[in-house]
Amino acid sequence: MTEQKKKLEKLSGVKGMNDILPQEAGLWEFFETTVKSMLRSYGYQNIRTPIVEHTQLFKRGIGEVTDIVEKEMYSFTDALNGENLTMRPENTAAVVRAAIEHNMLYDGPKRLWYIGPMFRHERPQRGRYRQFHQVGVEALGFAGPDADAEIIMMCQRLWDDLGLMGIKLEINSLGLAEERAAHRVELIAHLEKHMDVLDEEAKRRLYTNPLRVLDTKNPAMQEVAQNAPKLIDFLGEESRAHFEGLQRILKANNIPFTINPRLVRGLDYYNLTVFEWVTDKLGAQGTVAAGGRYDPLIEQLGGKPTAACGWAMGIERILELLKEEQLVPEDEGCDVYVVHQGDAAREQAFIIAERLRDTGLDVILHCSADGQTASFKSQMKRADASGAAFAVVLGEDEIANGTVGVKPLRDTNANGGKNEQQNVPAEDLTEFLINAMVATAEDGDD
């Protein structure tokens, strides 16, 4: 007597770490192609760093009293050697680590870009996930406001390339370390006068990272934050000149911006310029790109003092905007779907499919789902569902006559406006299909 097999429990993904399914992947590919083209046009080079880094990298780089390090990192102890490791919550520190480790700056400044998944342990919601994807740039070795302006303008070009409207730029200056120290004294004194209004999070940050109190979303604290001493009033001559230089370049290039004195960013490595690109179309998660200047970071991670600036943008949030503004490109499907009946036709179908791929056409070859040969009718349904422009048909008659059937599957002028099957000599198939594809493309442009 055999035991009845127990039904296995269906496994699901980790909450906040989402699958990107085929029907969504086309939008991702569209964005990735667009952003990579933009990055190349500015002379940026791709760098790829590991997903896992030593925990100390982020503690030293991001700051021990930041939300990311205190509450959001996925950290673990390596069972093999006891090392403390972390799945990257952001990538600037890792890129800087790689640049130092591989002595990349020995021959001058570098323009680098990256793309990939990041990980933060937080409550999943629209636009905020535990695994999320970022694309970012790091301009290493550039000290002037012109570099700040260029990386900001890169974002504007990307919005234009994607067709996105209404993303607004906010900028601020965090000045230099001594200016922040003077402001910190005044800020703490101001906040101490309003202890009865501060929430627990603000009280916790008061003496460790008081700048972050200004970034509060608590309605009860808005007036206190609004009336707090502004860091911009503490800027010295050098910091003011840098900030004014940035503004001049942005104005000269017709990049509108707002100065937001409460813009501080959540990472400790920033100085001088900080900026965010924000939208009101994504609810609470309105920041789609953010960055600034982080001159102290390279030295902080063991390198020689080197100026640097960069930005990162959340890909999921940008894709949400593309959907919101109905800018999702249509899936064009493949070019050709090959259907066949009989052993001889199947063998020839493989040869034809490979020959067509050699010309650059995208080709799907019908394969059986159950090991049995499907009828022509069933295969044609699959061809229609694939989104292919043409079906190539091979059966006993076609093999005997040395021909191939070609049937348009979309509305097209390639066959006199008729979607009727034509028989084409096998040796002429490639030329026929290429001409038909050109005619179809011209039809679509009319």
Swiss-Prot record:
PROSITE patterns in the record, alphabetically? AA_TRNA_LIGASE_II (PS50862)
Q: Which UniProt keywords apply?
A: Aminoacyl-tRNA synthetase, ATP-binding, Cytoplasm, Ligase, Nucleotide-binding, Protein biosynthesis
UniProt catalytic activity = tRNA(His) + L-histidine + ATP = L-histidyl-tRNA(His) + AMP + diphosphate + H(+)
InterPro entries in the record: aa-tRNA-synth_II, aa-tRNA-synth_II/BPL/LPL, Anticodon-bd, Anticodon-bd_dom_sf, His-tRNA-ligase, HisRS-like_core, HisRS/HisZ, HisRS_anticodon
GO cellular component, as recorded: cytoplasm
**Catalytic activity, EC:** 6.1.1.21
Q: What class of enzyme is it?
A: ligase
Q: For this protein, what is any one GO molecular function term?
A: ATP binding
Q: Name one matching Pfam family.
A: tRNA-synt_His
Q: Does the keyword Zinc-finger apply?
A: no
**Subcellular location(s) per record:** Cytoplasm
Where the protein is mainly located, per its record? Answer: cytoplasm
A Gene Ontology annotation in the biological process aspect, one of them, is: histidyl-tRNA aminoacylation
On subunit structure and binding partners, the annotation says:
Homodimer.
PANTHER family linked to this entry? HISTIDINE--TRNA LIGASE, MITOCHONDRIAL-RELATED (PTHR43707:SF1), HISTIDYL-TRNA SYNTHETASE (PTHR43707)
In the record, the note on similarity to other proteins reads: Belongs to the class-II aminoacyl-tRNA synthetase family.
- Its protein name is Histidine--tRNA ligase
Gene giving rise to this polypeptide: hisS
